[in-house]
């Protein structure tokens, strides 16, 4: 199978490495100097230092149309902010297309309260609905995938051809790929878990204990499910890899950038300091406001996400954000909106 991966960050490189032993894979970097450095060193020093790239993996820059010529699967491994441009550039492509990003697009008009960012499948529907497209998501740190550690992901698309292509491309000895046609649920899980991970990082940074962490994860899953149901997702999707699975990993894993933001805020760092120290994107910081804004518009209650936004905006201190949750009136345990 011939695969072209757009984007030589950690995740794009990790999947390219994973598939290169079984398929003909081209890893395309936007920056020519980066591509040359990776190809020469056979290592992505910036994103996956110490990991040798397999000899069969081709790394290139330059003409993207030429790089993906004849590809049977195109994988877009760019941040959410670049997805719209990438999908527009892929108009006319007949091969299946899949993106890897999780979160929401930055609002097109940040000054307008009525403007909010879109999930990836909504961008797809706006700019290139003719593409056969979908998402590869689930609980995964790029470093572990690149090292060949056991991982399970979900390929989500309304098109069976896209799901089948992703399974064929990446399912192997260490990486299991499950198929799901609920792209809305898979993407909601991938976006909301980043917001909730900031909350669990805050919990851990304040040393509130494992009971508190478990409560946040469980009630956070309820918020995620309510939000997803209101957008048309299926409830069972949130008990799968892209829901519960990704939430547990991102909320507890030491490699989680979103959890790290919460930890740093709990230690007294400003948001700007926390983000600057990461060196990479923490999508939860950028999608939290959109999640809350859309939830309000749908009449969905998301108190944990609301607390995270108040914390990020500086309206609540870490301690006040916790108090805003623990001081709530008792309610029945419920997942439904």
Curated annotation (Swiss-Prot):
GO terms for biological process: carbohydrate metabolic process; glycerol-3-phosphate biosynthetic process; glycerol-3-phosphate catabolic process; glycerophospholipid metabolic process; phospholipid biosynthetic process. The active site is at 193 (proton acceptor). NADPH binds at residues 11, 30, 102, 142, 257, 281, 283. Keywords: Cytoplasm, Lipid biosynthesis, Lipid metabolism, NAD, NADP, Nucleotide-binding, Oxidoreductase, Phospholipid biosynthesis, Phospholipid metabolism. It is found in: Cytoplasm. One of its GO terms (molecular function) is glycerol-3-phosphate dehydrogenase [NAD(P)+] activity. Its main location: cytoplasm. Its EC number is 1.1.1.94. Pathway: Membrane lipid metabolism; glycerophospholipid metabolism. Sn-glycerol 3-phosphate binds at residues 102, 138, 140, 193, 246, 256-258. It catalyses: sn-glycerol 3-phosphate + NAD(+) = dihydroxyacetone phosphate + NADH + H(+); sn-glycerol 3-phosphate + NADP(+) = dihydroxyacetone phosphate + NADPH + H(+). It is an enzyme of class 1 (oxidoreductase). GO terms for cellular component: cytosol. The keyword Lipid metabolism applies. Transmembrane segments: none annotated. Belongs to the NAD-dependent glycerol-3-phosphate dehydrogenase family. Catalyzes the reduction of the glycolytic intermediate dihydroxyacetone phosphate (DHAP) to sn-glycerol 3-phosphate (G3P), the key precursor for phospholipid synthesis. This is Glycerol-3-phosphate dehydrogenase [NAD(P)+]. It comes from Variovorax paradoxus (strain S110).
């Amino acid at each position: 199978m011939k695969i072209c991966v757009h984007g030589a960050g950690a995740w794009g490189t990790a999947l390219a490495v994973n598939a290169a032993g079984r398929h003909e894979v081209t890893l395309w970097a936007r920056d020519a100097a980066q591509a040359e450095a990776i190809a020469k060193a056979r290592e992505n020093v910036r994103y996956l230092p110490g990991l040798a790239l397999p000899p069969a993996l081709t790394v290139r820059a330059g003409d993207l149309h030429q790089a993906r010529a004849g590809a049977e699967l195109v994988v877009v491994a760019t941040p959410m902010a670049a997805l719209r441009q990438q999908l527009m550039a892929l108009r006319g492509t007949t091969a299946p297309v899949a993106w890897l990003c999780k979160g929401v697009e930055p609002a097109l008009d940040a000054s307008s309260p009525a403007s909010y960012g879109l999930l990836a499948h909504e961008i797809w529907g706006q700019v290139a609905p003719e593409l056969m497209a979908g998402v590869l998501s689930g609980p995964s740190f790029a470093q572990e995938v690149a090292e060949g550690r056991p991982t399970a992901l979900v390929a989500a698309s309304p098109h069976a051809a896209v799901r089948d292509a992703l399974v064929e491309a990446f399912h192997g000895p260490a990486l299991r790929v499950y198929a799901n046609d609920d792209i809305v649920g898979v993407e909601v899980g991938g976006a909301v878990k980043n917001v909730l991970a900031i909350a669990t990082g805050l919990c851990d940074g304040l040393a509130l204990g494992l009971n508190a962490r478990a409560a946040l994860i469980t009630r956070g899953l309820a918020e995620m499910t309510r939000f997803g149901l209101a957008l048309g997702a299926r409830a069972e999707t949130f008990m799968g890899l892209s829901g519960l699975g990704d939430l547990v990993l991102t909320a507890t894993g030491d490699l989680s950038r979103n959890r790290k933001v919460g930890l740093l805020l709990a230690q007294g760092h400003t948001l700007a300091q926390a983000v600057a120290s990461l060196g990479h994107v923490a999508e939860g910081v950028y999608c939290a406001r959109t999640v809350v804004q859309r939830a309000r518009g749908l009449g969905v209650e998301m108190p944990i996400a609301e607390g995270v936004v108040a914390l990020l905006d500086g309206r609540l201190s870490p301690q006040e954000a916790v108090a805003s949750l623990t001081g709530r009136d008792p309610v029945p345990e419920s997942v439904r909106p």
